[in-house]
Amino acid sequence: MGSDTLAAPPHGAPRVDRDVVSRFATCCRALGLTVNDRQRPADLTAARAGFAGLTHLAHDQCDAWIGLAAAGEVTPAVVDAVWRTVASAGVLQREIGLAAGELGFTYDTGWYLQFRATEPDDFQLAYAARLYEAGEFGEADGLVGEILARRPGWFDARWLQVAINHRAQRWSDVVRLLTPVVTLPSLDDVTSHAVRTALGISLARLGMFAPAMSYLEDPAGPIEVAAVDGALAKALTLRAQGEDDEATEVLQDLFATHPENTQVEQALLDTSFGLVTTTSARIEARSDPWDPETEPSEAEFVDPGAKDRKAHLLLEAEAELAEFIGLEEVKFQVARLKSSVAMAIRRQERGLAVAQRTNHLVFAGPPGTGKTTIARVVAKIYCGLGLLKKETVREVHRADLIGQHIGETEAKTNAIIDSALDGVLFLDEAYALVSTGAKNDFGLVAIDTLLARMENDRDRLVVIVAGYRKDLDAFLDTNEGLRSRFTRSIDFPSYTAPELVEIAVRMAEKRDSVFEKAAHDDMERLFTHLAQATTPDANGVERRSLDIAGNARFVRNLVERSEEEREYRLDHSDQEDFTDEEMMTITAGDVQRSAAPLLRGLGLSVPA
């Protein structure tokens, strides 16, 4: 608190009416305060009546209004009067010898926390809280901002600004204000709980689900309403991430303890109930900064920086594609795809006829040949060209879509698709949806749901299915609607042995490692053996051993395991110090000792 906030009036100030002072002293004793070494048990009813009468007699005395608020009358009218008469704050308190801070009241900030007001800056915050509750956001924010300019480190003022921005749904400003203080060790348990919950909710409302979960993972705490809000936000964040089972579990636990909460009940009954997200750019685009209703929708919003970002995405996609080793035909097909989409958009802009083409894709090839990475490249191309709003790729498998009971599969599939809208849905090992062959397989329900959404959300969803060519052909034959929607296909060949060696060398270079010449030769022999050998997969289908190993995925595992072998070898040598070259070099022995356990773990033969 500022030491001069209740300073004595200048010399020569008019004396206060003694009857007013006497009545004030009596009222303060009714609050239980010590006045002139006399104290009596608090009687708030008497205090409230006494201070109410005193405010009629001395309506220009701030201390009378402070006393009325201290007695429990923290109404908008009383808070307004405290602020209106703030210039006289402390006059009556000094007359009866009250110590600074003894007389005060507690006000609600409007979001989890309550603060005590005993001095003019406190009263200014209390008045600001009253203003924003009445919808006067601009004036309230100005009052708080004036205090923060003088006292930038004062948490009470910062929190009031947080509460104002929360009420106006300015989530990016809440994040900006709370991020610097969330880890402060000076926060008590109550304040820390409020800050963590508020920050988690605000991040979630901005669609930043991963960082939001770092604050919402354990929503429990001393503030009951914050614990409920945090748990609900956690559940809806999990739902937005496609983790429906976990979300339902949180909601069920929450409903068990708070069955009166209608939002929790609605979220349980309706799986489409979720977070309404926005962006900081859309918030800043409001015609009235404090009115969420003036914020442009996602469809209406024109981002002034979008053109530059789209150009950057196209450059990123081109650079990532160029980095790939091998895959020349894949690169060519992706380049053709980009040209096809780009020219279709240009023709449409000029009013020329554009043939109806599907943008959904089939990626056919064995594991580890870059299908997922190329899917991300395609997403950036589609977004950079304006076909999609996001470059996100939602990768899913059968287990993410299939439920155990009637109705569950449709709900799970719809939730996954909702999370992928405006981006790419990447369905890996798509044939697994129908691989059981059973007529009552819920995978067929997932396919029907997917087809319906591909039609209904055709402008907001691109689907890429991936897997082995024969498996994908069988998948596309399970429903007549699939073939017509997946007319574009890119084949991903297995890598050659020299390409895999080059991949290993490049991976090692990025990790400050280098293979000796003998290790190069050993890897090429190993990869050649795997490319020539065949092994039955889990379904009994003969596959190249290299495809079962996972192509580039196996290479990554081999590089990482070889580095571990190098570290172990050096650590158990008689040397006490090593050169940089020794610490970087992976030997043939390191590779050999790494390859054998990796192959055995995959059920593959170890070459002699």
From Swiss-Prot:
* Region (Disordered), start-end ranges: 284-303
CDD domains, alphabetized: AAA (cd00009)
One GO cellular component assignment for this chain's record is:
cytoplasm
Is Transferase there in the keyword field? no
Annotated Acidic residues bias: 290-301
The principal location of this protein is cytoplasm
SMART domains registered for this protein in UniProt: AAA
Going by the UniProt record, its keywords in alphabetical order are: ATP-binding, Cytoplasm, Nucleotide-binding
Looking up SUPFAM superfamilies in the UniProt record yields: P-loop containing nucleoside triphosphate hydrolases, TPR-like
Instruction: Give compartment(s).
Output: Cytoplasm
Q: Which GO terms describe its molecular function?
A: ATP binding; ATP hydrolysis activity
Chain sites annotated for binding ATP: G365, P366, P367, G368, T369, G370, K371, T372
Write down the Pfam families for this protein, in alphabetical order.
AAA, AAA_lid_6, T7SS_EccA1_N
Instruction: List cystine links.
Output: none
What does the function comment of this entry state?
Part of the ESX-3 specialized secretion system, which is required for siderophore-mediated iron acquisition and for the secretion of EsxH and EsxG. EccA3 exhibits ATPase activity and may provide energy for the export of ESX-3 substrates.
The UniProt entry's sequence similarity note says: Belongs to the CbxX/CfxQ family.
Q: Subunit structure of this entry?
A: Part of the ESX-3 / type VII secretion system (T7SS), which is composed of cytosolic and membrane components.
Q: What is this protein called?
A: ESX-3 secretion system protein EccA3
**Which gene codes for it?**
eccA3
